[in-house]
């Protein structure tokens, strides 16, 4: 029985606090590394004690496992001035986060700063397949060289060995690594670098064997996406080489996030000792894989959902796998989750506030591990050995299926009555645009922000005190109004054209709304990693969704009362609420999304009635829900766009609908972006030098666009000239009348010391370009 990978963050988010302490200069690297070592040891011991037989190592990362691989193979971009040897810690973090020029800015001094990439922008970051986890995108050139530059996989194996725990090291596969990479050279496919990369992997496998490893897990999730023939050939080539590098070291190729599809033959013909398949996302492939795979192959069955929080129906799973198990040597069947459990919270036992019935329907990483053990014991010892556990599992599934917390006839009836007219604006964009232009009278290149401002320690402290009952609502409201007023006055002072209230009342852009909607449940400690030290607590959609009362009206009214400038109403869109939640698995996602869209539609209507003339409906996560296979895209995009429009179209032509998207590559879904028909879309483009705008120009995208002109995920403060250059790049691609100027995402996670100069520079850059355009 294997776990493939487990959460890295620590039960009390120890990794987050250690990282942020190091980055702020409050603690040395030694403290960070000691915390990381303690987290690894605790994780290994817990898995061992729960009965896991194949415990992973090297699944831990200080920031991101793809970035770890970049460091491991020496693929550090030239701008970070690393040459050889082990990649230093500050170079590692500079690749992830960027950094300022001054050593004092990160609190470290001396040789920790020598030639370690300070003052440089971070590498690009994007979604890990179709999850809400982010990875750092490798940057590879056609003359790229590789060298083993980090012994982390070996070090972690030996670390566990010293504790008396034998582990199975986990590596990101070489083909997936290259498939995820990008190159500055147009037309160059990084897959061509495979012959240069493989010697690094071969050396690493030899070192792992010498250290005492008998198995290694190599993750190749690229096998569930569309591959071209040369990429399939690359997989065969790679594993023919790797299987011979250390012949006594057995390789388990782990494939997850979906069906093998037309890559099935490639996968089962790889010359490896084991193959892991995802039977949660693709249960239909069980029979085919079992029929075609060689019987000397160790078959790892991904039976427990590694991406969602629902308790499994264990008797049903055993019934389903009975035919394959009956025809396969039992010592060659491995029970596992569908994928690494990186994507779920750590332990349900920490949750003391959940209703008992709801809690009985759930399973986090610890409970999923126990479920795996039960399944493994049922196969090895017979069902009678775990009869009590199987009965409890079946009872929980039956209770959930009939619960009144799950089913609301009023919601189901409203969804059934949705009409096509409810998903269309009254007039076309050109009509709306003229009316909105006359209404607002904004200058060219209008400036705004995405919505949130820094959540300072004082803001978090006040929210926590209110949640604990230590701060009355009257006092909490007064505190928030003071924060909102200060933010509005400061925005006016620096000359922003369209303002926001700052979202100080919001803990999270999804959770804030979910807490006010019926059909959701919430955790106290259900944190999962989004990227680096950014952890989120996704709400859980347990039943039919509906809005009970207005959710944002009070705060918007107050902010707008302070200024004659327009203040945007700020909402999270239905697709993002869906994709950033743990979604019920008893309904199609499209049906759940329509329920959420109707709730947001009600809020949009109330905002407009109250006088809001600009309403932003963020769909930051629209693309991440895109299926991994292109053949499945259109069906998803059809209902996702329908849900956005259902949420946004109950307004008059003079009301301007904004939306925001981040972290995404949109070139392949530009039709859907246009079909959303938002009046203004703001997008994340700063890390990729506005590449997306080329696609929008080719498409002749008609509506207004705010390309992000500085990267908020980095602590760097961009100079006026840097921002001006990006605006000029945008002008070469789109008409001046289409362009807005804004950061590429919300500013919640940044410090005011970073935000203030950055936004001042952004406004100055917009004014300079405005003047240049007027005198041209």
Curated annotation (Swiss-Prot):
Q: Which cofactor does it need?
A: Zn(2+)
Sites where the protein binds 5-methyltetrahydropteroyltri-L-glutamate: 13-16, 127, 580, 624
Catalysed reaction, written as an equation:
5-methyltetrahydropteroyltri-L-glutamate + L-homocysteine = tetrahydropteroyltri-L-glutamate + L-methionine
User: What are the GO MF terms of this UniProt record?
Assistant: 5-methyltetrahydropteroyltriglutamate-homocysteine S-methyltransferase activity; zinc ion binding
Which InterPro entries does UniProt cross-reference here?
A: Cbl-indep_Met_Synth_N (IPR013215), Cobalamin-indep_Met_synthase (IPR006276), Met_Synth_C/arc (IPR002629), UROD/MetE-like_sf (IPR038071)
Cofactor binding mode, per the note?
A: Binds 1 zinc ion per subunit.
Question: Which positions does UniProt annotate for L-methionine binding?
Answer: 450-452, 503, 618
Report the family membership: Belongs to the vitamin-B12 independent methionine synthase family.
The protein depicted here goes by the name: 5-methyltetrahydropteroyltriglutamate--homocysteine methyltransferase
* Source taxonomy: Bacteria, Pseudomonadati, Pseudomonadota, Alphaproteobacteria, Hyphomicrobiales
Gene name on record? metE
